[in-house]
């Protein structure tokens, strides 16, 4: 898929949580745990007073530091998101897809550690890939745990966080649908090149042009027929720890 697809996804994601970000206020201090290449650090630095990103991968840290080098209120350093957290306090802590790599006990422990680093009235926002029911644990080369919204609620409750507000991530869903169509094209039109920027761009352009059907109506119809498609979902969760 073309870079425009990633830009579209990210723009839709920001739109999804925009009201939550507005509630924090421009003077807010932000911690991004597992910040990757710094896309969200850059977004937050353009909205808030100060942003700190922590990332384990040295390659990702270098990419993130380069990305936010022009922003004096943003800082990224290398560290383990579970062991090398700054003390804070922070008005807003963001985790963009870290929990799915942790077991349940580690999720609860990390949430408790993050909760202790919030300012009064501060919030935690998670962005996690999800399944519709229960848990799907993948083993092998790529080990990950996909949890349902209800399972995340239960883990938050174990960490002492009872106010949990989920929001579906339509930007992620659009990308997942596009990737499914690419897989279908490769399977049924195998005579075409599997890796083709032109074909990827054409696929994305057609899906975007038919967005009311491809990104909304089709998944709704299939879900009503009890056909879970796309298989994975993604949700944002706003967590408000009680005082």
List each model region and its residues.
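Class I (Rossmann-like) S-adenosyl-L-methionine-dependent methyltransferase catalytic domain
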Residues: 1-28, 36-85, 102-109, 123-243
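Conserved beta-strand/loop positions that form the S-adenosyl-L-methionine
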Residues: 33
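Short acidic/histidine-rich motifs immediately flanking catalytic phosphotransfer sites
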Residues: 89
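A conserved beta-strand element that flanks and buttresses the S-adenosyl-L-methionine
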Residues: 94
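Short catalytic micro-motifs in class I SAM-dependent methyltransferases
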Residues: 97-101
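A short glycine-rich, Lys/Arg-flanked "PGG" loop and its adjoining helix->strand segment in the class I
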Residues: 108-120
């Amino acid at each position: 898929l073309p870079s425009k697809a990633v830009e579209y996804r990210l723009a839709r994601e920001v739109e999804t949580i925009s009201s939550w970000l507005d509630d924090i206020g421009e003077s807010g201090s932000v911690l991004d745990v597992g910040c990757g290449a710094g896309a969200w650090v850059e977004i937050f630095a353009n909205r808030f007073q100060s942003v700190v990103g922590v990332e384990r991968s040295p390659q990702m840290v270098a990419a993130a530091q380069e990305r936010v080098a022009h922003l004096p209120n943003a800082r990224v350093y290398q560290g383990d998101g579970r062991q090398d957290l700054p003390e804070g306090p922070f008005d807003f802590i963001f985790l963009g897809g870290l929990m799915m790599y942790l077991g349940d006990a580690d999720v609860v422990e990390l949430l408790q550690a993050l909760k202790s680093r919030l300012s009064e009235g501060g919030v935690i926002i998670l962005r996690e890939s999800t399944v519709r029911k229960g848990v799907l644990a993948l083993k092998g080369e790529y080990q990950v745990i996909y949890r349902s919204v209800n399972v995340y609620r239960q883990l938050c409750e174990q960490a002492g966080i009872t106010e949990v507000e989920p929001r579906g991530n339509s930007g992620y869903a659009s990308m997942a649908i596009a990737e499914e169509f690419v897989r279908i094209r490769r399977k049924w039109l195998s005579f075409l090149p599997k890796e083709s920027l032109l074909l990827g761009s054409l696929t994305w352009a057609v899906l975007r042009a038919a967005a009311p059907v491809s990104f909304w109506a089709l998944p709704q119809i299939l879900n009503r027929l009890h056909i879970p498609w796309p298989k994975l979902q993604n949700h944002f969760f706003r967590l408000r720890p009680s005082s």
